[in-house]
């Protein structure tokens, strides 16, 4: 394969994703001639980076972040004419998508197990113009989860989402 874009959310999970940047890049270099890394800084960055990867015909996108980051990436490629392969490393608080896909929840283990030679198709959903890869909910629960700050997620992990 020719090129891959790594999309890393540095505020996901325990804010430790950047600690694995070099290891991810080295793993990707075993499979790809060109490895480009993008670091998100604000909402919609992952969507914009994924759209760029699709527009520029990247062979694959690897997202390292939580469910929100993965959903942003899915939104960035879902309606494009060309859709690159998608790999996910669990770096968030809940990592529900990677759990459903039975991806190793240990970051080092997930990186070690990355295999770009095989793919699986997954279903995605869309509501009000927003794509999602795992769960759709309405009402006070998603609002409460959305309002949990990065600091609380870092400090309390999944317990911060208990409301």
Sequence positions of predicted segments:
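ATP/NTP phosphate-donor binding region
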Residues: 1-61, 71, 75
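Glycine-rich beta-strand-to-loop/alpha-helix junction loops that act as flexible
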Residues: 10, 64-66, 89-91
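Catalytic core of DAGKc-family lipid kinases
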Residues: 31, 79-163
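Helix N-cap/beta->alpha junction signal
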Residues: 42, 65-66, 137
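Positions that flank functional sites
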Residues: 43, 68, 113
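Short Gly/Thr/Asp-enriched flexible loops that form oxyanion-binding sites at enzyme active sites
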Residues: 68-84
């Amino acid at each position: 394969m020719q090129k891959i874009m790594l999309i890393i959310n540095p505020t996901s999970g325990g804010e430790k994703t950047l600690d694995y940047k070099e290891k991810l890049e080295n793993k990707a270099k075993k499979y790809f001639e060109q490895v480009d890394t993008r670091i998100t800084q604000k909402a919609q960055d992952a969507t914009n980076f994924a759209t760029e990867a699709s527009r520029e015909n990247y062979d694959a996108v690897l997202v390292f972040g939580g469910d929100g980051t993965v959903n942003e990436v899915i939104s960035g490629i879902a309606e494009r004419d060309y859709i690159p392969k998608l790999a996910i490393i669990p770096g968030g608080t809940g990592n529900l998508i990677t759990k459903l896909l039975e991806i190793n929840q240990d970051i080092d283990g997930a990186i070690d197990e990355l295999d770009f030679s095989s793919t699986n198709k997954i279903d995605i959903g869309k509501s009000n113009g927003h794509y999602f890869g795992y769960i759709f909910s309405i009402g006070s629960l998603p609002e409460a989860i959305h309002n949990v700050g990065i600091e609380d997620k870092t400090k309390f992990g999944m317990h911060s989402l208990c409301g």
